[in-house]
Amino acid sequence: MIRQCVSHRGIPCYRLAVRRVELTEPFHHPSPRPLGRKNWSTSDEAKSKRAAMRKGGAPPPEHEDWELTVGIEIHAQLDTDAKLFSRASAALDDVPNSNIALFDIALPGSQPLFQPSTLIPAIRAAIALNCDIQRIRGQRIYELTHRLIEPYAKNGSIWLGAHDGIAKEDGEGVQIGIKQIQMEQDTAKSQELPSSTYLLDFNRVSRPLIEIITLPQIHSATTAAACVRKIQAILQSVGAVTTGMEMGGLRADVNVSVRKRSEAAGDHQYDGVAGLGQRTEIKNLSSFKAVEYAIIAERDRQIAVLKAGGTIQGETRGWTLGSTETRKLRGKEGEVDYRYMPDPDLGPVIIGDDVISDLRRNIPVLPDELLQMLVQDPKYGLSTVDAKTLIELDDGQRLEYYQDAVEILITLQPDLSADFSAGKVVGNWVLHELGGLLTKSSAHWDSQRVPAQSLAEIINLLSRKNITSSSAKSLLAMAFDGDKRSISQIVEDKNLLFQSLSRHEYIALAEEVMRQNPKMVSEIREKGQLGKMGWFVGQIKRIGDPNRVEAQKAEEILRELILK
């Protein structure tokens, strides 16, 4: 059971609901910087730096004597309808300032009211990341304040394998420790307009977040990006977060330090890891590539400073998309004491062991287990690359669609040979054929654009040789473009059912294309340029009926006639 204890003052917390707050006057503040986009450097040096970033995070030869160390702080929006300290809705897409309580905007006299349901996705995240729920006096308990004083989970870890895209120097895998996870609340959203005007939307205030802090055990920018990607996949798989980095539901800060391997260990220690160099923190990175490129830029900057005889200052820095350098935001000397203290209106929260046990029993399949299933289960039989792509695309929606299509196709084909791999075929169509249409149209994923039932029916017709490959792709394109007819109706209306050519008809078509291209026939016969057979197959499809020509049969006839 999860329960909130009564405040020691015995005073219940009430919320005075506010349906909507309208600001009659815009909020003005003199802008400290000019508006407009910062010009990117066009120098040869900057171009070469960006090219090096695109090639990956491996250090150049001149940096091999330097050790990079990275720790990551991930901030993720919890998947919950409730705010952390008020009863207002946590919905983000509603009208600005429509989901706020008096406490959200800190009106005098308003009091926080902790919402226990926000703990459920937070605990799921801790379990999935192998953390221990914090224990005090034999109970799972921690004090609440507007930022929780004590982390509710500690001492976790995740494993990154080669399939996760780690750096080559990390070998087959690396384990990264999770120092702690704590709950936080989000802040208001601001929008900057011309004339030093800012619009404020308080809907996001008090929306619950978790902050996941890794140990500084990462030594490659590539592995750091892989770590963030893996944690995002884990959080999504257990329903702990709303969306990923792609949709703004997850952000990362990185702590970066370097030290020379050939010299004595550094004087700094962070989170129990000693012998490190002075670290800097890069804030608010919103994509996996941003994590990787920002670390590379800061690594190179610190090495250049130290080589020139300078010292690294503890500071907070920023990085902008397209930039090859980080920029200073503010100084940061030592650990900051935020002087958090318990709120007298918020009593301790006790999380029962039965809740932990129940959530642990019902935790969904984690990404590594899912990857293993998609690769090793004969029903799917995907390659590791395709399986990972499906898991990561569209917050897992593409994977659900794929699995639905596989199940439907299997029910449509109880009589087909066991050699037919439904999972592999469907995977190819979902990732490449359907994925190609999405890329070409720049459309977002929508599982109903081509329902899984329709895709399975197309693949079923193709595998039974009732339609040709080109007809199958045409059917998919028509469904994708909004044709609401059933697949069977389109096949009937367009007369797409395959009617095989006779052997005599194949020979006649083959002889015709050979007669038109005697030089290429000679090159195949005399020089063994068999790759040109495919061109001849294409010509047979061009002069014949493409809906009746089987590429394999056409090539067999061509080989028979040309190589006899």
Swiss-Prot record:
Q: Where is this region: Disordered?
A: 26-63
| Keywords, alphabetical | ATP-binding, Ligase, Mitochondrion, Nucleotide-binding, Protein biosynthesis, Transit peptide
Q: EC annotation? A: 6.3.5.-
Instruction: State where the transit peptide lies.
Output: 1-88
Q: Which GO terms describe its molecular function?
A: ATP binding; glutaminyl-tRNA synthase (glutamine-hydrolyzing) activity
- Keyword Transit peptide in the entry? The reply is yes
- InterPro entries to which the protein is assigned, alphabetical: Asn/Gln-tRNA_amidoTrfase_suB/E, Asn/Gln-tRNA_Trfase_suB/E_cat, Asn/Gln_amidotransferase, Asn/Gln_tRNA_amidoTrase-B-like, GatB, GatB_Yqey_C_2, Gln-tRNA_amidoTrfase_suB_CS, Gln_synth/guanido_kin_cat_dom
Query: Which chemical reaction does it catalyze?
Result: L-glutamyl-tRNA(Gln) + L-glutamine + ATP + H2O = L-glutaminyl-tRNA(Gln) + L-glutamate + ADP + phosphate + H(+)
Q: Cellular component terms, GO, for this chain's entry?
A: glutamyl-tRNA(Gln) amidotransferase complex; mitochondrion
Keyword RNA-binding assigned to the entry: answer is no
Any single biological process term in GO: mitochondrial translation
**Could you tell me where this protein is found in the cell?**
Mitochondrion
Q: Which family does the record claim for this protein?
A: Belongs to the GatB/GatE family. GatB subfamily.
Q: What does this protein do?
A: Allows the formation of correctly charged Gln-tRNA(Gln) through the transamidation of misacylated Glu-tRNA(Gln) in the mitochondria. The reaction takes place in the presence of glutamine and ATP through an activated gamma-phospho-Glu-tRNA(Gln).
Indicate the quaternary assembly: Subunit of the heterotrimeric GatCAB amidotransferase (AdT) complex, composed of A, B and C subunits.
In Swiss-Prot or TrEMBL terms, this protein is called: Glutamyl-tRNA(Gln) amidotransferase subunit B, mitochondrial
